[in-house]
């Protein structure tokens, strides 16, 4: 299936010169959304994952249905101050500064096989920080799955030691 035909390109959002890839139109079509999740879930099953981890916020709308489809748990990665129990955190760079991601300290057990799922691979900063936290907790990142990859931003270069799956790529 050509998923690109179900993704809306929004010009100059969130700022001038950006061509934003909006997955909400894909998600509004139940058949297409199911097909996308099914393909990502197939990748997760092949990797024999124990848990799916997704970064805030669109990683939730990708990761949760994958976890459900394969009968595994889901672990959210949130921005600082959003999780109620003891966390570990990692700072990561943005084009305009820094931000911090957190995960519950007890979310992943040593040796668990983890799939990280998100909507978009751009520069790779968010996923790189997520990988770092999963590994710090003793998890093994066995795969990383995206709905969209922006190949021209070379985010995959930060993930060369991981098995990366993308439904569709924009070059």
Swiss-Prot record:
Catalyzed chemical reaction(s): AMP + diphosphate = 5-phospho-alpha-D-ribose 1-diphosphate + adenine
One annotated GO molecular function: adenine phosphoribosyltransferase activity
InterPro entries: Ade_phspho_trans, PRibTrfase_dom, PRTase-like, UPRTase/APRTase
CC annotations in GO: cytoplasm
SUPFAM superfamilies linked: PRTase-like
UniProt keywords, alphabetically: Cytoplasm, Glycosyltransferase, Purine salvage, Transferase
EC number: 2.4.2.7
Subunit organization: Homodimer.
Family indicated by similarity: Belongs to the purine/pyrimidine phosphoribosyltransferase family.
PANTHER family documented for this protein: ADENINE PHOSPHORIBOSYLTRANSFERASE
Protein name, per record: Adenine phosphoribosyltransferase
Originating gene: apt
